[in-house]
Amino acid sequence: MQKISLIAGLAVLVAACGGENKAPEQAPAATPAAEMAPAAAPAPTGTTHDVNMEFDGKTYHFVPSTLTIKAGDVVNFHNVSGGPHNVAFWADSIPAGAAAVLGANMPDQMQPLSGTMLVVQDAVYSISFAGAPEGEYKFYCLPHLAMGMKGMITVED
């Protein structure tokens, strides 16, 4: 009799604990790539300007160190000598709304508003000013800022 009671108890226990019918878990809905991607930068529409990054044996500098361009122009920064160099902008020294535009138009940033390091001579870093608001954009070379390597781009409409 004890065996029958034991078997019956086990059958009840198995029935009570097992076989819950759960709906299969659904994977979270995928976010479309268009929602995740940053806003596309406007296409450049203007002139291309060249700025050389140089060391003349005494000083590090951008040539030219000041430049006036139009919204839509592109500036190519060339590592001519004395590298590595980069170009970075002070967030508090650019026009309102410019940080978002530069963020979209500066490829391979090391950090916000700071372009990639150009370690190879003759390397070029291009920045489009498409959609850039008018005003002054003060920039510098991170490795050589303490040695005075800085400049300014003025964007006109």
Which residue stretches match the model-derived regions?
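Sec-dependent signal peptide recognition
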Residues: 2-9
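Extracytoplasmic copper-binding redox domains, predominantly the cupredoxin/blue-copper superfamily
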Residues: 18-157
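C-terminal motif of bacterial Sec signal peptides marking the signal peptidase cleavage site
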Residues: 13-16
